[in-house]
């Protein structure tokens, strides 16, 4: 069925899946990822939008800053260990934890990938404007990659954030927030900039 919808060896495919809406998949999510690997072959790449489970956003003040007294209680983003955001589904976390998976370093726009070009897709992901020109999303467009929406609604397509970033719209709002990231084994609070989406 995956070949019938146009997937082919060597393709780069970003998948968004809502498994409850997709219906029964024999073998579950692992079987789906294995089937994608079979179709794409060793040169193909599977990508997912992971984001991360950053439950502290309700604590931000109007300036996008976390109160100093709470900082020690908030774990930093670690590309190797931080879970994918739960709202992004089981497939995102499954791909993130697969053997050989790579993950990009931008907390809010992070992607994980497995396959032939996983390292290239996830390398050099800018910390500011994470949906922009040097993102896994831009690289997916560059290689004419595909997006597989499996039971997920169209508004879940993270590639739309890349289009929003590129759109020449006057007065686009810039959001600045502090984010804890792991740098050489210690937590560093860094202010990030992103277009509001």
Model-based region annotation:
Residues 1-197:
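N-terminal and secondary-structure boundary signal
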